[in-house]
Amino acid sequence: MTSSKPKKTSRVRKTTKNSKKNNPVTMPVLPKTPPSFKNKVVDKKALKNLVSWAYKTHGTAITSAMADNLKDLGFKYATQAAVSISVDDLKVPEAKQDLIGQAEEQISATEECYRLGEITEVERHTKVIDTWTETNERLVDAVKNNFNQNDPLNSVWMMANSGARGNMSQVRQLVGMRGLMANPQGEIIDLPIRTNFREGLTVTEYVISSYGARKGLVDTALRTADSGYLTRRLVDVAQDVIVREEDCGTELSIVVEAEDGKFGARLLGRLTAEDIFDAEENIVVSQNTAIDPSLSEEIEKASINKVKIRSPLTCEANRSVCRRCYGWALAHNHLVDLGEAVGIIAAQSIGEPGTQLTMRTFHTGGVSTAESGVVRSRISGKVEFSSKAKVRGYRTPHGVEAKQAEVDFTLKIVPQSNNSGKAQKIEVSSGSLLFVDDGEEINSDITVAQITAGAVKKSVEKATKDVICDLAGQVRYDKVIQPKEVTDRQGNITLKAQRLGRLWVLAGDVYNLPPNARPVISSGKNVDEGTVLAEASQSSEFGGQVRLRESIGDSREVQIVTTSMSLTNFKLIEESTHSGQIYNLESSDGTSYRLNISPGSKINSGEVIADLTDERFRTKTGGLIKYAPGLSVKKARSSKNGFEVSQGGTLLWIPQETHEINKDISLLMIEDMKWIEAGTEVVKDIFSQTSGIVTVTQKNDILREITVRNGNFYECDDEEVLNRFTEEGNLVNPGEKILDGVDNTEILFVQKLETSKCRGLLLRTVEEFTIPDQAELPQLSHVKQEKGPHLGLKAIQRLTYKDGELIKSVEGVELLRTHLSIESFDATPQMTIDVESIKDDKDESINRLNLVILESILVRRDTVSDASHGSTHTELQVNNNQLVKAGDVIATTQILCKEKGLVQLPNVVDDEPIRRLIVEREQDKIKVKISDKAVVKVGDRVVDGDPITKTVKSTSCGEIEEISNSSVTLRLGRPYMVSPDSVLHVKDGDLVLRGDGLALLVFERQKTGDIVQGLPRIEELLEARRPRDSATLCKKSGIVQIKKGNDEESVSLSVIEKDDLVNEYQLLIGKNIMVSDGQQVTGGESLTDGPINPHELLDCYFNDLKDQKPLIDAARESISKLQRSMVSEVQNVYKSQGVAIDDKHIEVIVRQMTSKVRIEDAGDTTLLPGELIELRQVEDTNQAMAITGGAPAEFTPVLLGITKASLNTDSFISAASFQETTRVLTEAAIEGKSDWLRGLKENVIIGRLIPAGTGFSGFVEELSSEAGPHPDILAEESGGYRRAQNLRPDYTVDMPQSPAVSSTAILDDPSDEDLETTRNRHGIDPSSSNFAAFARPNAENQFSEDQLPDPAALEGLQEEGLLSDE
């Protein structure tokens, strides 16, 4: 953070100008004399200055002693004064009631304007909020004055005023008013809290207040995290910026311009880049002098407006900043020390205020504030604009017609002759709003102007607000609105207003018509109460027999029997069981069906209604099922119902009894593979049902299953016989030979059995079941009708199990089921079938089953009228049991008129049905009596106060309907102002009810000036994000040409560049053009409004400059232009929050963001296209190419956001410890990168001493020892001479043989000491070394055989320019 300025004291300048010249970096000596005694109150600021003076003059020890003494002094007097705070100290200023009264008057006036349609809903909201904000500001002044005049020693006032604790914003809430609050979405609630905490809040206010307080807390939590992350990224990008050099010797500099002749703190601690002369050509400050406050004042006194200073942005030190470019270290106001980690200091200086700014909302408890420079007149008098004033009409956000200044000028209020006093001067900046006209006479305390602050760029956002209708009626547009249909990308058509205008709703009684109602009356008819306005009819779809039901609720049901089917050859028999009623169908031949449904239920088509109760297909036990050839089923199995039989045949059944047991083996009571009789106990309490051979399945001494298979067992050892059969079993037809001595006269199922004792075959009997092709059903019914749905019954046979399935069971199972299912044809899916039980026609004692399809029609009851519907009357047009045809009307509903009046129908579009109509009643009109001629005509729309005749004014809003000699009839209405670009939800002539949406107002609103918008903005700048809807920038300098298109909207903009090239720019709809026709523009200038895309800006600067200058200069200059704009943008955000950060910190960060260029074309260099590399490095490479005559590399400058810059640093350890660790390390490994451990982070991770502070000197020694005999290698890029090994193998540069070049390439021979240290470091014995570079050739020691030079190494050293060709 910047230190506050030392207190201005009389300075003793000891150094003379001459001595400064000789010794470039002298520090002006600070006065040792203390500031003179001042007899006035010392507040927080004065204390700050005192302590800072002591620290800068006398160092830490003395300052801390002084601070201690100050503390004792403070406590001593605080104890004696016994200051405390009680509730009585909170004094509410008397002016509060008046101020709130004034505000309420203004607001009711605003509401009235809104009611008259003079301002839009948005303007009303804005005006209300601004009125309260302004009242709040005035109340703060009242609080200050009240305390100052009436009670200057009030303890609350002393506390806030001295800076001990609290601030005016908090005191205002205690004794003024709490003010406006924001809701959780950040929108301001237009109901302010008028009370303060001293008076206490009402319940509503309390709830709203806690809303805002909650938002403050939540915001704080979120912002703290954001701010911390921002600091982390900043530290990461700048951690390796350390002051490593005394002076980089650059000749570049940046220019600082004075604002209003003042430099403020912007020159403090910087070194001048050149001598500064005053108007008489005397040197004011010589080159490389640090500027202290007194020098800064001298420069201002000499009215010098531009000063060139050295800056980290232009420092040419390699990978660091030199002392002179950085200037003072702001901790002690002396030149920065070598080894100072200025990057980290910069990162913390920018990141730390983020957290503070967060606290901003927190301390004011979420109360919203907004800054506006409203100027009020202090005297009454006449307004005079200066001669150069230029103004144009402007509608303010409050809907007030005002003037906007186009240029800066001065406005005077000259007092009237009788009132002697000084004229009031107001400096008006361009863009400010003026509420008075030139020459107008005004009173004192009138709002004259609203001056815009240039520096603060308030961010605006697009927002929308709905306009809701307050009364029912008919919509009319004013002509000025000029609605236009706009089609968006999805093809949706919306209606938009093009101009500011009113949308009227003219009163009337609007009726909603039911969906199928049609008006039976024509437009313009007079109607009485009870007249039928519209009729709706309900008709039958299919026709049939009518059944009238009892009424239910508010509607009656009419049923029409479309189809009915009675099962006349079945009796319906009801049985009662303990689980409920069961119904059976019995036919005359004795077959019986069990019904699955009960009368009174509804079923769908295809449902099974009954099952045949058939014992023929029931088995006694479980077993194995086989389909004999010829029996086929449909593939699909419905899991519940089994397989449908498509062709009858024989079903084979091999019974076997299976007991599933899961008990201990000790309970087994029989032996495996033994024959048992029916009734044998196999396991305790489990008995066999059949006789046969028993098989036991066990696992881990647990009995799993016991199977009993009937049949005869024959022992057999003949392999050939046994191999014919399997353990699963085979079917054997009658007459086939199985074993000698066994005759088979029927189908048998033969299984091979092997036990420990014997082997053999088990012959099992097979039961056969015959299945018919069709289910035997008594007469199947089918009912057919000419039109509409009909019904049929169908019998389906389904097999329960699939072929080869083993059914493990003791009880029997049903193998085949016969279902009765109902089918309906031509019915709609939502039609259900009703099941009914009816008495037989001939014999009342017999019940029959009846299936019907019903069409049900709900007929409305009569209703009494309500707000949106007229009363209705419904009549049935049919009787019970009547037969009706399809399309016959069953009932009609009439909509009746509520009150007498005039009917109007809306305009019909494309045969759309009419859904609403309106009746204009007597109470929707008023008559105004007139005596003289009317000044209005029929169809005019007037609001309160508009003249109807010269003497009579209108008392309400509405449209003139008729004018007679004695009166004017006005149809009441309500105007709504809509702004341009609003979306209209209704068309001209539409009918609306109260609460309908009329339009969506689109407007730009300022976001509350809170770091909530500050932090993201800083992040956006430092991450170099591409903003949405960015401004169109001029690519190259030239002259603007603007052409209007055919319609008013479209405009084409082109720039005529030099060589008469015309460059046309595509303009997006809704963008405002910021330049005028014929204006001269430079590359990078904004042509339209909107946020600027920094990447595009850099490209524009570079493309514009590279035609005029060499590539490297163009890159330098374009980067420097971008850097300046970035620094000022970041500063603007912080300044708007009242935070002071020294420019140099931001410069250090911006320097890191702009240090790289992207190679576009490598030329003959070893660089790769697309590689990101430092500008200085490319410059060196290209200089080498210029010497060797190769093609230089071409490049474009790039701007990297802080995250991207961190990931692109030379150190892969630092990058990997920041983000995307895996990717960074993988790439580094593949590319074979080396990390030279230059920054702080890498060294911390490796665990070495960091190369800053006290570790700096060791680092320098290590670097120089690493360079060995060639210290200039330190200036080389990170690879050093190892880069020679990375050259592409197929790559050679032919060195031109001119002697001039080779002579420049010869280096001074290293001294003997250099060679010695290098040999020692690498442990090289000169006698045994065969590497020529480490031995000095002399007369005896020519390149002898044993000292063969390594050709690759020599070539590498030559290419690096470390060895000459000779």
From Swiss-Prot:
Stored InterPro entries: DNA-dir_RpoC2_beta_pp, DNA-dir_RpoC_beta_prime, RNA_pol_Rpb1_3, RNA_pol_Rpb1_3_sf, RNA_pol_Rpb1_4, RNA_pol_Rpb1_5, Rpb1_funnel_sf
Reactions listed under catalytic activity: RNA(n) + a ribonucleoside 5'-triphosphate = RNA(n+1) + diphosphate
EC code(s) of this entry: 2.7.7.6
Cofactor, how bound (note): Binds 1 Zn(2+) ion per subunit.
UniProt keywords, alphabetically: DNA-directed RNA polymerase, Metal-binding, Nucleotidyltransferase, Transcription, Transferase, Zinc
Cofactor: Zn(2+)
Family note: Belongs to the RNA polymerase beta' chain family. RpoC2 subfamily.
Protein name: DNA-directed RNA polymerase subunit beta'
